[in-house]
């Protein structure tokens, strides 16, 4: 029998706050909830009556919202204020947990209550993995039949990620642990370093091109993340690039051996930026960085570093090369594409135990010797250019860090979070741990042992795999050899369940008998085989439809101010619709924001239509088109109208509100580029032009590229972080809707269901963009480089390099088969 847990004395894991003495605590004893109706009831949200600040009230409200969203998603009904909509089996659970959290927050503090909820969520995740009822006293408030439902455990386990950000105590502890980890040393055996070096060399030879294309260096560096020189508020990386260009000479530069071409003449971006960064790296000391803490949802924090600009530029060059290989790696390919179904199908036929792996502070604990061995192997392969190897050396060597308290250290361990190459190096190290264990498993044991298929999928420090127990033990041992520590509560082994990228997977298996070379033992007068092994083989993998709650409870958008609720809610809900049931999303979203749909409807925006059809983007209860007749007429003109470009009317309207820097100027330049292009429905041909089926993608990429160039020359755009008001959006939408109806005045309102309309809409978007290979002046059209897998992409980049090089070096780089027909290199502008 388990010992009772005294909630007055126990401290939840991850608690951020001060624990009051036992005599002063107001937490309940096990089995009792001494709550006064006037102060701590579930119907009254603790707030001003407890003397809390606005921040404390907001964090506690988010805590309660996470529980309500989880219950709504599980039951599929909207949880109203009176809880009468919930099934009776869940009403008591909701009321009692809210009361317990209220009393605990009043007596022990809001941070203690949040930490308690996170501990409960972790217990639900562990219970779901093991298939046993979670070991937490919250479960006693559920009826026995409901308490044993694994689907409920799975949904409640997502509460932890949706909790508020970490607190002050998390920040202090994280900085101390970060400094201790990066100041420590870890000895790696020499044979392990040799194996890592050989593995990375072999990996590069298999996944990277034998002749590295130097034109990859022509892609611009973009972003607004903080650097050592400038904070994000001061413009970040974009402003630092501007400063770097303006403060550097542009003519008569000395040649650099690491560059495959050069030197450049004039302010030729981005090659000139790369050239200047390489000079600063060779002339400087250890790269410098400023350490800061980013508070993340899930009651935790992350320590990041803002590094020097030239190190980031070199790192981005190396990252682009490594990502070309990672996209070809079968263990990452489907994940990077976002094809989770293909990721799960890969395990069908694998035999053994399911392992879900997650490492603790993985990037901080990688020894520098391990990172250096991986870079040595990549360099030995000859698949990377010298400037890219220089970027890897800069990002994996010692770093001089300055902490918020003014202290400084030079790292002896760790590849920093915030450097471009960190994620790629982490993947290579993780792949070595699995492949080395797999190779060792196949070499050991009986030489006639039957082959057992094993496999894994990797994404940074996350891994899910299926394999025999001996292979998994070798994998864990390899992680220890390279200094990794498994994350407690996130590293699981199970016969039929796993977690990968916060998606819950169930593996259906069948027992299979593998017979080796037969060895018998005598039992009486019989001979009995003794070398048979029974091992489960995966026959099917199912992804649970339990929805993640983090984005629904409160969403954010990278690179911009905190978005208004009406913007973030639509983005979060629509992103879940393709993978999760509509009923669950609607129930959770309307529980959190019951009046948002009415707010849209008052301004004439249909709330439950996708944005590409002129709606707000919220997920509705059904696929019925809930819109007035005038809007349904606009949809008919949008989908079935004769104008080939009309299908993108609403899409372009919403894109106009996205936070790209210098959006107006970039869009105007794109319109100028595309003025001579022709857009038609599939079927019509233009013999003197080249057709691209996804022409709108070309336009979007063109605008984003122009935005990046403007940001590099002009610095960050202060208006790119702001959002329009909802009334401005409604006014713009009304104008687009009116223009669509005027295109086809006699059109009838659409009467089909939403699924049929979206299917027809996808067909109407299939327009061919016909472009000319040369502009009016006879020069090669640079818009062609924007299309993925375009035959002209490589050739155009070679022309860019030719335009940056001195005349005498052009012939050494360019070959006739690289250039479009009748192209004269000397005529390139």
Curated annotation (Swiss-Prot):
Q: Which residues form a coiled coil?
A: none
Q: Where is this region: Disordered?
A: 1-39
Q: InterPro entries from the xrefs?
A: DNA/RNA_pol_sf
Q: Which reaction does it catalyse?
A: RNA(n) + a ribonucleoside 5'-triphosphate = RNA(n+1) + diphosphate
Keywords in alphabetical order, please.
Answer: Host cytoplasm, Nucleotidyltransferase, Ribonucleoprotein, RNA-binding, RNA-directed RNA polymerase, Transferase, Viral RNA replication
Q: What class of enzyme is it?
A: transferase
Q: Which GO terms describe its cellular component?
A: host cell cytoplasm; ribonucleoprotein complex
**Where this protein primarily resides, as one coarse class?**
host cell
Highest taxon listed in the record's lineage: Viruses
Q: Where does it localize?
A: Host cytoplasm
> EC number(s) on record?
2.7.7.48
GO molecular-function terms, A-Z: RNA binding; RNA-directed RNA polymerase activity
What is the stated purpose of this protein? RNA-directed RNA polymerase that replicates the viral (+) and (-) genome.
Q: How does it assemble?
A: Forms a ribonucleoprotein complex with the 20S RNA, where a single polymerase molecule binds to a single viral RNA genome. Since the viral RNA is not encapsidated, ribonucleoprotein complex formation appears to be the strategy to survive in the host as persistent virus.
The miscellaneous annotation reads: Yeast strains also contain a double-stranded RNA (dsRNA) called W. The (+)-strand of W is identical to the single-stranded 20S RNA. The W dsRNA seems to be a by-product of the viral RNA replication cycle.
Q: What is this protein called?
A: RNA-directed RNA polymerase
What is this organism's lineage?
A: Viruses, Riboviria, Orthornavirae, Lenarviricota, Amabiliviricetes
